[in-house]
Structures are given as C-alpha cells and as structure tokens.
Amino acid sequence: VLSIPHSCQALNVTTNAKKTMTKIFTLIICFGIMQTTFGQMTTEKEKSLQTVLDKTVDNKKVFGTSFAFKKDTLIWQGSAGNMTIDQPYFIASTTKLFTTAIILKLRAEGKLSLDDKISKYIDKSILSELHIYKEKDYSQELTIKHLLSHTSGLPDYFQGKGTSGKSLENEITEGNDQFWTFEQAIERTKKMTPLFAPGTKGKANYSDANFQLLGKIIETITHKTYAENCNEFIIQPLGLTKTYLYQDLTDKIPKKLYYKSNELNIPKAMTSFGADGGMVSTSTDMLIFIEAFFTGKLFPSTYIDELQEWNNIFFPMQSGIGIHLFKLPWIFNPTGAVPYFIGHSGLSGALAYFSPKENIFIVGTVNQVSHPDISFKTMIKLTQQLKKK
C-alpha cells in the first residue's frame, strides 16, 4: 500500500518555458491513500477516470479536455466539455518530441552526430553573431546536442522580450496574431543576450530558437521540408490519421485554443512555429506516437538512456536531450506514489509522457494557454485513479 497523508499542498512555481508552464502558476496536488494495482478496467474505474475530466472542465479556465493512456494492454480514452476523443488540437511544444525523433532517426542512419557543430548545416549568415556571451563569439561552437538539451545558452525568441519590451507570447495573447519566418526568429534571437556559454556544466535555458535551428538542420540534411520529414519518419510509419504540421491559415480543423475565458485565434503564429511547436494531433494519435517514441519504433531504443541527462530548467521540470523530466519533489511525494514522467508538454496545455516505473503512457490537453499547469494536475489525478484499488 502506498499511502500519503490526506493534505492539499500548494506550490508556487515560476517558469521561463514557452509551452510548458508560463509566468507563475500554482501546482496543487491533493493526495489520498492509494494502492498500486492494475488489472481489467471496471465500469467503476472508467467512471472515476471520466469524473476527473468532467471536474477539470469548469468553463472558467478549462472548456474542453481530451486524455488517453495505456498501461500494458489496458487502454483508456476520455474527453469532456467542448472536446471529443478524436478532436484534433494544437500540441504546441510537444512538437519537439517529433523533432527529436527525426534527429535521432537521422543519427541512426549515420546522417548526423549529436556532437556535430551546427555550422556544418547552417549558413554562416544565419550563425553570424548568434551567440556572443561576455564579448566572446560562441556561434561556431554550438552543437546539435546543445540545441536538443537546451544547453546552448541561446535566449528564447518567443518568450524573451524584444525591442518593444514585450515578448511574442505577450503580443499574441493580447490579440496581435502575426507571422514570422525562420530567419526572423533567429534575427530576434540575435537581438537578445545569451545566458551562458554553450555546454556550461549544470546550465540549461529553454529556448525555442534551439528547435527552430534543429528544424532547419533536418531540412538541410534531407532536402525535404519539416512537414515532409514528419510524414516520412513518423506519421506514415505509425499510421497516424489526424496528425500534421499546421500550415494553412484557413484550416479550421484544430480546436481553437483558449486564453483565459476567450478563444485565441492565432493561425498566423501557429503556421510560424514549425519544428518548435506547430503540430496538430489527437489524443488517439499521440498515444500511438508516445509509445513508439519510447519503445524503439522510431529510433533505436538504446538511445533512450542517453537522452536522460538532466539539467534543472524550470521547477519542477528538468531538461534532458530532447525530452523533459516531470518529477515531484520528495516533500510533496515522500513515498514516491506519484511516479516520475519523461516526455514533453506545451503552452497549449498539451502533454505526452511516459512513466517507466509504472509503464504508463499518457497524453492529452486542457487546451488552455493561460493555465497549461492544469494538464499536469489532470495527469496526476488520472494516474492516482488508475492506481486506486
């Protein structure tokens, strides 16, 4: 029996990440006594899981949610509010798992090494003065691994403040939808100050510029677009039916995002994210994807251990190589009843994670930009219900 005192803990957390947790959020975890047991899904168990989603939708912060998980041969899917199980939604920075998978596939094919300098693939004009820290130019020292692990020291073009004093995130959530190109994202990055020299021990800084560069590297090596690479390496092999890179401004298929109580209509921005956050998917498709990612169906499974080289990035998350670690601190999880998860999440409230300890794959979204933290609470509550006897 895994027991935790009946208490409700509140933890104020400040983050720098664009698509995981922004600003200051309160992570509230209410623990009760639970037992670890898995077996056949009962009607009562299904109802308890559905109740978690029903209660998540309050029509104030969350208007719709969709989640799915797999434990061994047990699969459950549910939705609530204005979303259905098969409703496509923006997965935001969870897209980075797609980018990571493609990079690792290219590595397996011998087309790149994680230690390659990115100058091998990126034009000099793009790299020129990209990373100047304490009057030294480190631009030519950046490697693919630095980008994947957010240890490049590059600032975040999306969440960092520009010359206007506002971040792109601020501008977009205030209603100023806008386009940007890869080149513009990098130019914006150059106008900001790097945080540390590439590969500084114990240092990591979440930056979408890293994955903009990785997307360009993928296109340079393959001579194909990022979307074409996603189709070739991931979507077609896995038989995903509702997963694609958002590129068409007139595409109304994905569920509109919410920012606080209002719909957030930002098609221009969503077509601009690309390799750092532009994918659309469903919980059904994402469950297939996250299992494939961690079981060797997309790249050699032996790579997974290598990816787990953790650096603190924003509490309670840690950054590995292309993946994140979500692990509650001991004070809030003294018996380890809530397992750690590895995967990724996004500002939209989307996430895709795997619990190695429990062999649980879980994906979903709360589709709320102002409260992406709620998706983590939902993930924890679903896991608790699944583990209750």
What annotation goes with each model-predicted range?
Residues 41-58:
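Short N-terminal segments immediately surrounding and downstream of signal-peptide cleavage
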Residues 340-343, 348-361:
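Short, surface-exposed beta-strand/loop micro-motifs that present aromatic residues
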Residues 1-44:
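Bacterial Sec-dependent N-terminal signal peptides
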Residues 59-64, 81-146, 197-207, 274-277, ...:
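Short active-site loop at a secondary-structure junction
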Residues 130-342:
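Short, surface-exposed loop or secondary-structure junction motifs
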Residues 53, 67, 72, 96-99, ...:
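Residue-level preference for non-acidic, small/hydrophobic
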Residues 328, 370-389:
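Short, gly/Ser/Thr-rich active-site loops of penicillin-recognizing serine hydrolases
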Residues 53-84, 88-90, 179, 323-325, ...:
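A short, well-structured edge-of-sheet supersecondary motif
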